[in-house]
């Protein structure tokens, strides 16, 4: 199956561009020749012939049924197709997460071999990647907006003090300018605070590991990440026609893995909550994707996938417990 492939095959599927951050980390670790050819840096981007062969057969098999996949295929009057929601940034985010997991494993491996110098070098690389990952996640979660709101609040306090001094000295021209600046900053602060609050109070209809179906394109998908609002660029949102959605960009967006048997050329999609639908009955059908075994422990009794602990911690999501049903024992 696809998910049995090694980590070294992950970046060859489709036209995946690895971020400059990840590429720099890989090259840096590789230059150190850490732990020989067992280190991820020496094989992370190495292509697997057996995987390419399997991937080619998957694509050929699906070419025969691409037109009959879903009655709403093609996006209706919009003329969109699934590739409009392709997200290289989401895929890169996942690859960085893989790199974190692998570096942590290599640190432990070096410690077990009592190669402490190597372990220290790996730990330093891991710390760099973790710090960058945290910074990116905080930006998505609104931490930067909250900080910006606080900065504007401090500026307003200072301007009010200047305003009072201008009034006391009867410099009414300066006072008028300061009053206008304060009004402008207050409006900006209110908007930024509202954005930060939206991030903090975000509610998600779907959870990590849940199997879903795209409302328009019909493909099956599994949630592997989530943002309170759309974090993609304005050009991406324009191409995906996000503004035509009922809630636009101000709604949760999900990183989803797409079943390669349905769309072998679309690994990761970035989809609005409005465009996703949970199945009425448990989906226990086979789901193929090269990232599955790295992001999930396996499937639960309802057919959804169980995210690894590190993935839950990344998005600060609780562990999902499948409700007990006595009929399952029959």
Curated annotation (Swiss-Prot):
Question: InterPro entries, per this entry?
Answer: Clp_protease_adapter_ClpF (IPR053189), Hemimethylated_DNA-bd_dom (IPR011722), Hemimethylated_DNA-bd_sf (IPR036623), UVR_dom (IPR001943)
Quick check: keyword Plastid in the entry?
A: yes
The signal sequence is none
Highest taxon of the source?
Answer: Eukaryota
Q: Where is this region: NTD, required for CLPS1-binding?
A: 66-138
Q: What happens when the gene is disrupted?
A: Reduction by 10 precent of total chlorophyll, with slight increase of chlorophyll a/b ratio and slight decrease of chlorophyll-to-carotenoid ratios. Overaccumulation of ClpS1 protein.
Per the UniProt record, which residue ranges are transmembrane? none
Transit peptide interval: 1-65
Where does the UniProt annotation locate this protein? Plastid, Chloroplast
Summarizing the function annotation, the protein's role is: Clp protease adapter that facilitates CLPS1 recruitment to ClpC chaperones thus forming a binary adapter for selective substrate recognition and delivery to plastid Clp protease system (CLPC).
| Assembly description | Binds to CLPC1 and CLPC2. Interacts with ClpS1; this interaction stimulates their association with ClpC. Associates with the Clp substrate HEMA1 (GluTR).
Stated name of the protein: Clp protease adapter protein ClpF, chloroplastic
Which organism was this protein described from?
A: Arabidopsis thaliana
What gene is this protein translated from? Answer: CLPF
């Amino acid at each position: 199956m696809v998910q049995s492939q090694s980590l070294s095959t992950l970046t060859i599927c489709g036209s995946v561009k690895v971020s400059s951050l990840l590429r720099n980390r890989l090259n840096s670790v590789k230059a150190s020749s850490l732990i020989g050819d067992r280190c991820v840096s020496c094989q992370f981007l190495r292509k697997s012939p057996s995987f390419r062969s399997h991937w080619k057969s998957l694509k050929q098999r699906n070419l025969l049924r691409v037109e009959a996949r879903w009655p709403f295929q093609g996006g209706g009057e919009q003329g969109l197709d699934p590739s409009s929601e392709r997200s290289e940034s989401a895929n890169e985010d996942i690859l960085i997460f893989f790199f974190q997991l692998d570096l942590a494993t290599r640190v432990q491996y070096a410690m077990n071999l009592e190669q402490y110098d190597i372990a220290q070098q790996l730990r330093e690389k891991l710390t760099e990647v973790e710090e960058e990952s945290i910074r990116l996640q905080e930006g998505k979660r609104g931490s930067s907006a909250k900080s910006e709101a606080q900065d504007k609040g401090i500026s307003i306090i200072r301007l009010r003090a200047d305003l009072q001094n201008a009034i006391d000295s009867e410099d009414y021209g300066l006072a008028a300018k300061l009053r206008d600046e304060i009004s402008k900053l207050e409006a900006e602060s209110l908007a930024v605070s509202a954005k930060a609050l939206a991030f903090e109070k975000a509610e998600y209809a779907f959870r990590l590991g849940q199997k879903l179906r795209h409302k328009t394109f019909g493909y099956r998908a599994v949630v592997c990440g989530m943002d309170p609002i759309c974090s993609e660029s304005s050009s991406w949102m324009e191409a995906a026609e996000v503004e035509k959605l009922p809630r636009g960009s101000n709604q949760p967006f999900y990183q989803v893995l797409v079943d390669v048997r349905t769309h072998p050329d679309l690994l990761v999609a970035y989809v609005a909550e409005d465009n996703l639908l949970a199945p009425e009955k448990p989906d226990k059908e086979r789901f193929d994707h090269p990232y599955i075994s790295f992001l999930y422990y396996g499937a639960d009794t309802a057919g959804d996938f169980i995210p690894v602990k590190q993935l839950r911690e990344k998005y600060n999501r609780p562990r999902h417990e499948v409700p007990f049903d006595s009929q399952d024992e029959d």
